[in-house]
């Protein structure tokens, strides 16, 4: 099956379609690139297809911040339009403007 194109770019702020968290994209895999063990731990009835982009997020919920790995089908644009509260944001991004983060110049390729 064909691989779909990434809907969100580096620095985009997104939220999960089902679970209560949001985050900023810091890396994108064109298709699933995590372990089979990780994939198999997802309940089968909600397990996403592997042939779609997967996003690495600096994520936050009401309680904590963490790194999340999420399929494109489970992400939506964030409508809060505020910055993400994660301690690593300042290490990767410069400013937050117009609802997205600008990647630090030294990290761009």
Feature roles, as predicted:
Residues 13, 46-47:
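Beta-strand elements of modular eukaryotic interaction domains
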Residues 9-11, 41-43, 87:
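Residue-level detector of functional hotspots within protein domains
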Residues 22-24, 56:
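Generic detector of isolated residues embedded in canonical secondary-structure elements
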Residues 32-41:
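Short, solvent-exposed secondary-structure boundary/capping segments
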Residues 1-13, 18-22, 29-32, 104-109:
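Mixed-charge, Lys/Arg-rich low-complexity intrinsically disordered regions
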Residues 47-109:
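Intrinsically disordered, low-complexity, charged/polar segments
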Residues 25-26, 37:
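Short amphipathic alpha-helical leader/targeting segments
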Residues 27-30, 61:
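A short beta-strand motif that forms part of the nucleic acid-binding face
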